[in-house]
């Protein structure tokens, strides 16, 4: 299991942040239906592998497909909240 900085800061006796999304995750995997959520702090569990989530990034929802490498991480790590800066070159030079 890979530990994020958020998971390391959390006490061991508290356990992972497990969230009930209000739907059956296994049915969403079979039906290929994305689960829409704003809970970025939810820990990804092994039963979520193969599911698609739409994670809120503050403005819109980012599509995230869960793979085995993501187990133990948080949903919010895969939905960036900030835009990457791109320097625009001018043609006058």
From Swiss-Prot:
GO MF term (any one): structural constituent of ribosome
A UniProt-annotated Pfam family: Ribosomal_S19
One GO BP annotation of this record: ribosomal small subunit assembly
Disulphide linkage map: none
UniProt keyword annotations, A-Z: Mitochondrion, Ribonucleoprotein, Ribosomal protein
SUPFAM superfamilies: Ribosomal protein S19
The UniProt record lists the keyword Endoplasmic reticulum: no
Highest taxon of the lineage: Eukaryota
Subcellular location(s) of the protein: Mitochondrion
Cellular component GO terms held in the UniProt record: mitochondrial small ribosomal subunit; mitochondrion
Family note: Belongs to the universal ribosomal protein uS19 family.
Function (record text): Component of the mitochondrial ribosome (mitoribosome), a dedicated translation machinery responsible for the synthesis of mitochondrial genome-encoded proteins, including at least some of the essential transmembrane subunits of the mitochondrial respiratory chain. The mitoribosomes are attached to the mitochondrial inner membrane and translation products are cotranslationally integrated into the membrane.
HAMAP family recorded: Ribosomal_uS19
Subunit note: Component of the mitochondrial small ribosomal subunit (mt-SSU). Mature yeast 74S mitochondrial ribosomes consist of a small (37S) and a large (54S) subunit. The 37S small subunit contains a 15S ribosomal RNA (15S mt-rRNA) and at least 32 different proteins. The 54S large subunit contains a 21S rRNA (21S mt-rRNA) and at least 45 different proteins.
Name of the protein this chain belongs to: Small ribosomal subunit protein uS19m
Lineage, highest ranks first: Eukaryota, Fungi, Dikarya, Ascomycota, Taphrinomycotina
